[in-house]
């Protein structure tokens, strides 16, 4: 059926915009124009409103409105942009920007205890001999649910980058209700 939902689209749009912000950082560290940023976000949301939503397909809502996605998404993005992590990225980690891996288009394969793993990191940052892997989350905190995902990221990075586990730090970055 190819259905999406409001929470899924908040996550998808947040990921897409953070990817754009990080790719912009590769070219410029100039401050982000808030008005243009919000207009860009609204255009992305308008495009996503053309998808088939669970909430309308099953008659929970008649129509999905832009504000139903915008409010939480802009909160997530503003939390990211005002976080100490983003400050660290643009002030310190930027030094190794040529080695950043931002939302690769394909899944990477790895092995863990003889099993194949397929992973797709949101953002990988080599910095001062370590690897930091950030995974953006816009939903509820659930450390148990995501711990296996973090192990997969660490295994992938170890396998492909020839790094020891102690030099790899996978991080769940919660964007809502505040950046954690």
Where are these regions (language model features)?
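A non-catalytic, helix-rich entry segment at domain boundaries
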Residues: 17-104
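Alpha-helix N-cap/helix-initiation sites
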Residues: 7-11, 34, 163-166
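Active-site oxyanion-binding pockets that recognize sulfate/phosphate
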Residues: 4, 59, 63, 139, ...
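C-terminal, charged and often intrinsically disordered regions of DNA end-processing helicases
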Residues: 1-7
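Short His/Asp/Glu-rich catalytic/ion-coordination signatures at enzyme active sites or charged loops
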Residues: 2, 54-58, 180
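Generic recognition of stable, solvent-exposed alpha-helical segments in well-folded globular domains
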Residues: 9-13, 68, 72, 118, ...
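Short, hydrophobic/amphipathic alpha-helical patches that form generic packing surfaces
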Residues: 1, 12-23, 155
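Mg2+/Mn2+-dependent nuclease catalytic core
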Residues: 100-180
């Amino acid at each position: 059926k190819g259905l999406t939902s409001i929470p899924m689209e908040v996550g998808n749009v947040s990921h897409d915009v953070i990817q754009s912000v990080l790719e912009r950082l590769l070219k410029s560290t100039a401050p982000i124009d808030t008005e243009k940023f919000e207009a860009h976000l609204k255009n992305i949301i308008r495009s996503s409103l053309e998808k088939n939503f669970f909430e309308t397909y099953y008659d929970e809502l008649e129509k999905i409105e832009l504000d139903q996605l915008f409010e939480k998404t802009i909160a997530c993005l503003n939390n990211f942009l005002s976080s100490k992590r983003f400050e660290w990225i643009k002030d310190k980690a930027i030094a190794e920007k040529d080695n950043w891996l931002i939302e690769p288009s394909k899944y990477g394969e790895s092995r863990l205890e003889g099993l194949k793993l397929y992973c797709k990191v949101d953002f990988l940052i080599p910095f001062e001999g370590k690897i930091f892997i950030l995974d953006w989350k816009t939903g509820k905190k659930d450390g148990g649910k995501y711990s296996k995902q973090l192990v997969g990221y660490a295994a992938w990075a170890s396998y492909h980058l020839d790094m020891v586990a102690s030099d790899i730090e996978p991080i769940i970055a919660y964007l809502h209700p505040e950046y954690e």
